Amino acid sequence: MSFAEEFEANLVSLAHVLQKKYALLRDLDKSLQENQRQNEQRCEKEIEDIRRGRAGNITPNTSLTKFSEEALDEQKHSVRIADEKVTLAMQAYDLVDMHVQQLDQYMKKSDEVIRKEKEAAAATLELENNGKAGNAGEGGRGGRKKTRLATAASTAAASTGMTSSNMDLDLPVDPNEPTYCICNQVSFGEMVACDNNACKIEWFHFGCVGLKEQPKGKWYCPECATVKKSRKGR
């Protein structure tokens, strides 16, 4: 059970507990009011008896003494009821306060989880963007080869047996996109990198240089291969 589910279950339980405590508080309040009413009536009767002249009697009146003691006991009972009401109210307050603190902790945990998820998503997006930028400008030096996914135009050309050197692309081209190969066109389809560090073109379409698959080992474009052979012949 997750924290949210557990907290929701505790809230349902809290509602029932508070309902019982509030019902008991109402009962105690009614009892307290009735006890105070009866005690007030008793006190008023005693005061009325005193006014009628019984207070001037030097002989102790045991009935009045007993009456006063009963009134005092009733007043003490009212105090006990009031104390019980305060205890119940404090218990209800503590229960609500405990759940509020739990909710605060849950909100803090949720905020922390959301913050970490946002940071992870931002880091992933940055890595993807860096990877795309690296693929666009990555050189093929040191024998590294790169294969690009074919565009719709290059796929159609391959199915008809046409090479990129004699294929007329009608697709819109971004004027800011870099061009490659001896055909001086943008990157599409599978491409191979020349292993000559000084190669001016660097990347070539398979079809333009007569390749059908990635060459094994080092590979040099026609121009660099010619220069390399001429240097060996000297």
Swiss-Prot record:
One of its GO terms (molecular function) is methylated histone binding. A zinc finger (PHD-type) spans 178-227. Changing W203A: Abolishes binding to H3K4me2/3. The keyword Zinc-finger applies. CDD domains: ING_plant, PHD_Yng1p_like. InterPro entries: ING_fam, ING_N_histone-binding, Zinc_finger_PHD-type_CS, Znf_FYVE_PHD, Znf_PHD, Znf_PHD-finger, Znf_RING/FYVE/PHD. One of its GO terms (cellular component) is nucleus. PROSITE patterns: ZF_PHD_1 (PS01359), ZF_PHD_2 (PS50016). Signal peptide: none annotated. Zn(2+) 2 binds at C194, C199, C221, C224. Zn(2+) 1 binds at C181, C183, H205, C208. The PHD-type zinc finger mediates the binding to H3K4me3. This is PHD finger protein ING1. It comes from Arabidopsis thaliana (Mouse-ear cress).
